[in-house]
A protein has these predicted regions:
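Aromatic "clamp/platform" in nucleotide-sugar-dependent glycosyltransferases that forms part
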Residues: 319
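Conserved acidic donor-binding segment of nucleotide-sugar-dependent glycosyltransferases
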Residues: 351-352, 356-364, 373-378
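Short hydrophobic beta-strand element within catalytic cores of glycosyltransferases
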Residues: 336-339
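Carbohydrate-associated surface elements
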Residues: 198, 220
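Nucleotide-activated donor-binding/catalytic signature segment of Leloir-type glycosyltransferases, i.e.
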Residues: 280-302
Length: 428
């Protein structure tokens, strides 16, 4: 395998074990990064498990089917016997039945032989946080491997276990068993992309990584799609967050909404779908918020952008974020943002208060005060929105993300070529 020159277009295999198109960072990352890479003149083929991404027409998609055991409206379904094709399908089903999450491991088992058989067609493989052991066989076969760690899922694990009743904690530990696998594999990948310094520090701490493995490459936002638009709806607050995931802090936001004075006329739209009968639905009922909270699921990117631009305030109440696409989307929309001062959010928003208001995580009183203050002060909302848009335009473009990613690709390719050449040198 010859190494491409320093300016030659690269042939990139971008892998993602699931790529939900319009929500969740993985699908957005795959779509936007692949689009920008081809815009820079590179050739990209995405290999994805379901749900499959929606990609630029210039990007080739190779579907890597699975049993898709978590698909709505029937998650944790029982497959028909005719659906089982091989041992990997059996492993996927058995892992689900024993309370584990199989997809990162089983996706890599499926995609690795495909990549190995087509190794001559690519210059580099870029894994989007599957980090299954089978991917290492691709690297050993001579294909340079780069991986993205949005943040170590160990953070999600600890927060979910802490929030769960005692009788669910053992099951959650089993569910998050794949995290140990990801840490083991990540330690063997020489080039890892992380979106923030915060994620870098957390990956070093939780995954035992070396600082020299990590490259901080912030994500971007589509500033043509997410932009200031027409008039805003009085009192509208928008949050893009998984409704029943403790990490996202929606319960804190709901309690803050309940505490807001009536004169603000505050109404919350959450871009998510709560679990029927789950903790979020119960809390909405308990707080008497059914008339003030609307859940909007299944929106397109354009629909999300229009909604975000119509709000007076956006909120990211997370207990942790490795980057936060919803935060930069709100900022690009010129919408005044209130966010938790955790993880990478201070890196994204800035600490000077010009582009957004940071509050302590899980502090209902502070969140109530911050949101209420913005709803009562149109001039301050406008000033924050203007500064936020300028910050995004300066720091967070997908083109810059793609350019920085290509620099890491070329470094990984050059190092792999040097290692091959060293192996081929005759022993003196």
């Amino acid at each position: 395998m010859s190494s491409p020159g320093p300016t030659r277009p690269l042939r990139v295999a971008l892998t993602s074990y699931r790529s939900k198109p319009h929500c969740g960072g993985q699908g957005v990352y795959v779509r936007q990064l692949s689009r920008e890479l081809v815009g820079l003149g590179h050739h990209v083929e995405v290999f994805s498990g379901p749900p499959y991404p929606e990609l630029d027409e210039r990007v080739r998609l190779t579907r890597v089917p699975s049993l898709d055991l978590y698909a709505e409206p029937d998650p944790f379904r029982l497959p028909r016997p005719s659906e089982f094709r091989d041992r990997t399908d059996l492993l996927e089903f058995a892992t689900m039945c024993t309370a584990g999450f199989p997809e990162p491991r089983t996706f890599c088992r499926r995609v690795a032989p495909i990549l190995a058989a087509r190794a001559s067609e690519f210059d580099v493989v870029h894994d989007n946080q599957a980090l299954g052991p089978a991917l290492l066989t691709v690297a050993r076969a001579g294909l340079p491997l780069v991986a993205t760690i949005h943040h170590p899922i160990s953070v999600d694990r600890e927060l979910e276990i802490a929030a769960a009743p005692w009788y669910r904690q053992l099951t959650l530990r089993r569910w998050f068993g794949f995290v140990r696998m990801q840490a083991r594999v990540a330690r063997q990948v020489d080039h890892l992309l992380v979106p923030s310094l915060s994620s870098s520090h957390d990956a070093i701490r939780d995954f035992g990584l070396r600082p020299d493995q990590l490259h901080v490459v912030p994500m971007g936002v589509d500033t043509d799609l997410f932009r200031p638009r027409g008039p805003r709806v009085p009192g509208r607050i928008v949050a893009l967050c998984s409704a029943d995931v403790p990490l996202k802090g929606l319960a804190v936001l709901l309690r803050a909404l309940a505490a807001l004075p009536d004169e603000h006329g505050a109404r919350l739209t959450v871009v998510s779908r709560p679990q029927p009968g789950g903790q979020t639905e119960k809390l909405v009922a308990e707080l008497g918020l059914a008339h003030r909270v609307h859940f909007a699921a299944g929106l397109t990117d354009a629909g999300i952008a229009e909604l975000m631009a119509s709000a007076e305030v956006a909120c990211v109440p997370s207990l942790y974020e490795g980057f936060s696409l919803p935060a930069v989307e709100a900022m690009a929309s010129g919408t005044a943002l209130v966010a938790s001062d955790v993880g990478a959010l201070a890196e994204v928003v800035g600490r000077d208060g010009r582009a957004g208001v940071l509050v302590p995580a899980a502090d209902v009183g502070a969140l109530t005060t911050a949101i209420g203050g913005l709803l009562a002060d149109p001039a301050r909302r406008t000033a924050i929105g203007t500064s936020a848009r300028a910050r995004v335009e300066e720091r967070f473009s997908w083109t810059a993300t793609a350019q920085a990613t290509v620099r890491v690709y070329r470094r990984a390719i050059a190092e792999a070529a040097a290692a091959r050449n060293a192996e081929q040198q005759p022993v003196a």
